[in-house]
Amino acid sequence: ELLNGYLMHKDSVVSRIENDIILNDNYRLPLMLKKGADITPWICSRAVDRHRTNSRLLKKVIRLTDTSDASTVLKAHAATVTDNYWIKFDGENIEYKNILLNDDSLADVALFGTFESISNAKYIHCEYSKSPELTNIGSFEKCWRLRNNKWYMYKKESPQERFSEIFIYKLGTFFGYDMAQYEQDGDCVVTEDFTLSKKYDFESAASIVGDDEDYTLNYKKLYEI
């Protein structure tokens, strides 16, 4: 089914969407998008990695009948923890506050494949999800947890991977770079949402260069911005 509605940034319309196509050119468009672009790849880029074992379990828990990337993301109105974009469907009378992700009751399912946190769930079987796990991208088993009204990402890793994340954070800090802070918690690393509760919109380098790891190309593309 083709998508008709609006690409939103908070409560502002960024672009009209008709039959999956972005109709308006706007400086607020995500870097992946431009006028005339098909919005489907952008939507799918926000999906939880389908190859993660716990992501498949997560979809079963919330009874997703269509487990495609696009359908999974749209179950949460394409909202994420790290930016303010979302999709408003034609016929909906809702505001940004109505789709904000504020439920971490699926955290244990997403991170460990266990169900301890589900007893507190409020939105598991609602038409639209308030959980951030459907749009928690990346290949590691991970989850978002709320602590003092702030989101923290927990990522399950091997000892070597945990060392690498924490070492790079401390090395960058030593040289004066503004780094995302990582700390160890058992067999996980933990980092606070570095967008400062969506004060900033996070755009990954993949939005600019895709999966190309050529340093020269990456530098040129970033310089052009």
Show where each model-derived region lies:
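Phosphate/dinucleotide-binding and metal-coordinating scaffold of catalytic cores
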Residues: E1-I225
